[in-house]
UniProtKB/Swiss-Prot annotation:
It is a multi-pass membrane protein. Belongs to the UPF0391 family. This is UPF0391 membrane protein rrnAC2507. GO terms for cellular component: plasma membrane. Keywords: Cell membrane, Membrane, Transmembrane, Transmembrane helix. It comes from Haloarcula marismortui (strain ATCC 43049 / DSM 3752 / JCM 8966 / VKM B-1809). The lineage of its organism: Archaea, Methanobacteriati, Methanobacteriota, Stenosarchaea group, Halobacteria. The chain crosses the membrane at residues 5-25, 27-47. It comes from the Archaea. Pfam families: DUF1328. Signal peptide: none annotated. It is found in: Cell membrane.
C-alpha cells in the first residue's frame, strides 16, 4: 500500500509540473497496486 500512495503523490506532482506521461504511468501503476491490495485484503477477510 505504501508504494501505491507514493505513486499517487508522484502522479499528482508530475501532473502539476506538466509531465503528463510520467503522471499517467504513475497513476496507472498506483491504481493497479491499490486493486491488488484490495483483492488480497478481501480474500484475507473471507478466509
Amino acid at each position: 500500500m505504501y508504494y501505491a500512495v507514493v505513486l499517487v503523490i508522484l502522479a499528482v506532482v508530475a501532473g502539476i509540473a506538466g509531465f503528463r506521461g510520467i503522471a499517467g504511468l504513475s497513476f496507472r501503476v498506483a491504481k493497479f497496486l491499490i486493486v491488488i491490495f484490495l483483492v488480497l485484503a478481501l480474500v484475507t477477510f473471507l478466509l
